[in-house]
């Protein structure tokens, strides 16, 4: 009831000068059918499907492709198929993307995985994040141009990066300079979720100590990772996200191999000590990462991308002197006043 009153007050305040009256659901004379809008939205979404674009960044050998395949229980990584986008932006870092349509229980998702082979693999990794920053901002620019088109598409194709999963090697020490510099720069333009790769190489105590040191380094360097406190919309969401923030970075293990454990088939890695069950939270935090990216926060990642990161870029671009937004025809996909 308190929440309903707050919503009514907010609505009244958002419409100054207009008289508003409310009839609560309990005061209605009969069934109206307002809740049916949820079914309408569900049917529309199931028919159209939706897009989700995830970037994976980290040095070679950390199991990026394997983890992505494990997340979506299918061969969706760059190594599993030919890329539909490939660009060598520098001598060291290349970007590849592959797209798949995944369907589950009638819901279709166009999943695009952007990989960054070559990142952090050189002796001199100076400015190795620049090609990635360039790619992320190029997708914002592409979306912005489509928005400004006079005869724009009913549904603008969305290639913006909704999430960047950053892989940290399980050193057990602290963040490296390259980790700090990358997350400081990318955290301003995209939602970053850091993970400790191949966490089975650490003991449980080593893992917890490493996670704590990483959180200290993130705070000391002003690095913002998803989900950010400032974007929490209500107390309930704040409590949920606080638990996630206390668990970051997730210590993960990826595999596409199944093993028999107590008569059940489980995804896991076989070691001389036994089977490490990927989806067993007592063994690693893969399930927590999966729940965050897919089951609980996927739509929020898309919303933060559109309402925060893209909006910041859009406002900056429209305020730049080389934009003139006077009415006019579009030529070659750009407004006639575009000088960029």
Question: Model regions: which residues?
Answer:
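Residues immediately flanking
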Residues: 59, 116, 170, 198, ...
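Conserved Switch II/interswitch segment of TRAFAC-class P-loop GTPases
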Residues: 28, 119-125, 133-177, 193-194, ...
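Extended hydrophobic secondary-structure segments that form protein cores and membrane-embedded regions
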Residues: 55-56, 112-115, 162-167, 249-252
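Intrinsically disordered, low-complexity regulatory regions enriched in Ser/Pro/Gly/Thr
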Residues: 45-50, 59-61, 94, 103-108, ...
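Conserved G1/Walker A P-loop phosphate-binding module
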Residues: 1-139, 280, 290-294, 337-338
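Alpha-helical scaffold elements adjacent to nucleotide-binding pockets in ATP/GTP-utilizing enzyme cores
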Residues: 67-71, 128-131, 135, 182-185, ...
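Active-site phosphate-binding and catalytic loops of NTP-dependent enzymes
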Residues: 78-81, 141-148, 225-227
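Conserved GTP-binding G-domain of TRAFAC-class P-loop NTPases and closely related GTPase folds
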Residues: 160, 177-178, 188-340
């Amino acid at each position: 009831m308190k929440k309903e009153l707050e919503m009514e007050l907010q609505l009244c305040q958002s419409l100054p000068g207009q008289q508003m009256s409310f009839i609560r659901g309990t005061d209605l004379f009969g069934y109206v059918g307002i809740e049916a809008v949820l079914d309408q939205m569900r049917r529309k979404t199931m028919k159209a499907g939706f897009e989700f674009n995830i970037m994976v960044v980290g040095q070679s050998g950390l199991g990026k492709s394997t983890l992505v395949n494990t997340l979506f229980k299918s061969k969706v990584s760059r190594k599993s198929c030919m890329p539909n986008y490939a660009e060598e932006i520098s001598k060291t870092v290349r970007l590849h993307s592959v797209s798949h349509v995944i369907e589950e229980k009638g819901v279709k998702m166009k999943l695009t995985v952007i990989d960054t082979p070559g990142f952090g693999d050189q002796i001199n990794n100076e400015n190795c994040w620049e090609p990635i920053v360039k790619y992320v901002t190029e997708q914002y620019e592409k979306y912005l141009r489509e928005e400004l088109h006079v005869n724009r598409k009913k549904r603008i194709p969305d290639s913006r990066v909704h999430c960047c999963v950053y892989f940290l090697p399980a050193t057990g020490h602290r963040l490296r300079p390259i980790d700090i510099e990358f997350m400081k720069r990318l955290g301003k333009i995209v939602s970053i979720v850091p993970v400790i790769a191949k966490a089975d190489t650490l003991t449980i105590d080593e893992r917890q100590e490493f996670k704590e040191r990483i959180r200290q380094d993130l705070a000391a360097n002003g690095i913002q990772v998803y989900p950010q406190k400032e974007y929490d919309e209500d107390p309930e969401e704040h409590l949920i996200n606080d638990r996630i923030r206390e668990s970051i970075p997730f210590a993960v293990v990826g595999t596409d191999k199944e093993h028999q454990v107590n008569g059940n088939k489980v995804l896991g890695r076989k070691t001389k000590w036994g089977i490490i069950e990927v989806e067993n939270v007592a063994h690693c935090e893969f399930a927590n990462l999966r729940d965050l990216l897919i089951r609980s926060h996927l739509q929020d990642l898309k919303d933060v991308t559109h309402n925060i990161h893209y909006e910041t870029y859009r406002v900056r671009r429209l305020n730049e002197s080389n934009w003139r937004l006077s009415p006019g025809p579009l030529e070659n996909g750009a407004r006639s006043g575009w000088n960029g």
